A protein has these predicted regions:
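Interface amphipathic segments
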Residues: 1-288
């Protein structure tokens, strides 16, 4: 059985023909939303932007220059500490934070942007000192950056890490990096992704990625394709010295859905050691399999 006390809470809304402003305070959580539009104009703009967004989802095509004019001009700010209803809800799922700040805005002279920063984010026994997110418009693109930074003595193998990339039309890019306390890179690789109404295609980049602190080589023109009729096609061959990870469709195509997986001398210890709470496992992995998917 769990109970939670009711914190002092206030909510206010002011609107006229020129502007709308909403404020809410509960415990140490504060939210402010403002727009230079009346309530009726705001509702109409939200309906219009929802319709534009739904159209982009239907066509599976991201275009921020098309979405931006449909959005209302607005400014949103949220700040919170440990004593509020949001933290209480998260704690029921074993998540909590010490401090949170977020802001979002869109106006005629500036692109759409959303920023978020949390400090002391915990999940179970894992503590992340600082987590940041930055999502913004750059022309037609929607660009994103997620960052993680830990203080000395906490997760020193992941002193800094980040995920960044963009979405535009029917293409996307995902890049990952990680550095330990000494500044040594453990991971640095990315995926270029395209999609249609029948498939998703991904390619590993760059040609010299890092996995588990080790430099690898990736074959030019590599790809992984998943078709929505559940067929898989691939031509990916990554090597580092005597280590190899390859997944390929057999020459000539083979039977529909045939995939060959070739793993040789793969050292799993360095990569596993980067993850929090990973078991102390080491070894060399090898396999040569023919799969029918």
């Amino acid at each position: 059985h769990r109970t939670d006390r009711i914190r002092p809470t206030s909510v206010s809304l002011r609107t006229d023909s020129a502007a709308t402003r909403a404020e809410a305070v509960s415990g140490d959580l504060s939210l402010t939303f403002s727009t230079p539009q009346s309530a009726d104009s705001l509702i109409a703009a939200l309906t219009r932007s929802a319709r534009t967004l739904a159209g982009q989802i239907d066509t599976q095509s991201v275009d921020m220059e098309q979405l931006k004019p449909a959005l209302p001009d607005f400014a949103l700010r949220v700040s919170a500490g440990p004593d509020n209803i949001l933290n209480s809800l998260l704690k029921s799922r074993k998540i909590a934070f010490d401090k949170l700040n977020a802001e979002g805005m869109s106006c005629d002279s500036l692109p759409v942007s959303v920023r978020l920063r949390t400090e002391g984010l915990t999940y179970g026994n894992v503590v992340l000192d600082t987590v940041t997110a930055d999502i913004r418009q750059n022309g037609k693109r929607l660009e994103y950056v997620l960052g993680l930074a830990n203080a000395p003595g906490n997760l020193d193998n992941i002193a800094r890490a980040g995920l960044y990339g963009h979405l535009v039309r029917n293409t996307g890019q995902v890049n990952l990096y990680q550095r330990n306390r000494a500044g040594r890179e453990g991971f640095r690789f990315g995926l270029d992704v395209t999609w249609t109404d029948s498939l998703i295609r991904a390619s590993v980049t760059p040609s010299d990625p890092l996995f588990g602190f080790e430099p690898w080589t990736v074959n030019p023109g590599n790809y992984l394709i998943y078709r929505f009729d559940k067929r898989v096609e691939a031509d990916l061959d990554m090597t580092h010295g005597d280590q190899r990870f390859a997944i390929r469709t057999p020459p000539g195509g083979g039977a529909s859905g045939d995939i060959r997986l070739d793993i040789a001398g793969l050292n799993i210890g360095p990569a596993l050691g980067l993850f929090p709470s990973a078991p102390p496992v080491d070894g060399v992995l090898g396999a040569n399999l023919a799969l029918n998917l």
